[in-house]
Structure formats: C-alpha cells, structure tokens
Amino acid sequence: MKVRASVKKICRNCKVIKRNGVVRVICSSDPKHKQRQG
C-alpha cells in the first residue's frame, strides 16, 4: 500500500474507488499497485 498525495491508475486493471471519503486505487493483477490518498 502506497500513500500518495496524487493517486493514479498504473495499469489497465487498476480501479479508482472512494471508500469512507478516502480515494483509493485497487488492482486485481498486481497488489503492489494498491494506493491510498493521504
């Protein structure tokens, strides 16, 4: 899980979602692509 000021999709399987007011990126193909805005 990377915590970044700016979250971006890294690959085509990444999805940007908003969970409890926090913007996150989840990825089914590569767990290293997980990000959280903060």
Curated annotation (Swiss-Prot):
**Key word Cell membrane present:** no
Enumerate the Pfam families for this protein.
Ribosomal_L36 (PF00444)
MF-aspect GO terms: structural constituent of ribosome
Q: Which GO terms describe its biological process?
A: translation
Say if the entry is tagged with keyword Ribosomal protein: yes
InterPro entries according to UniProt: Ribosomal_bL36 (IPR000473), Ribosomal_bL36_sp (IPR035977)
**Gene Ontology CC: one annotated term:** cytoplasm
Classify the source by domain of life: Bacteria
- The residues the entry assigns to the signal sequence are none
Print the keywords alphabetically. Ribonucleoprotein, Ribosomal protein
**Which family does the UniProt entry place this protein in?**
Belongs to the bacterial ribosomal protein bL36 family.
Protein name (record): Large ribosomal subunit protein bL36
Q: What is the lineage of its organism?
A: Bacteria, Pseudomonadati, Pseudomonadota, Gammaproteobacteria, Alteromonadales
The gene is rpmJ
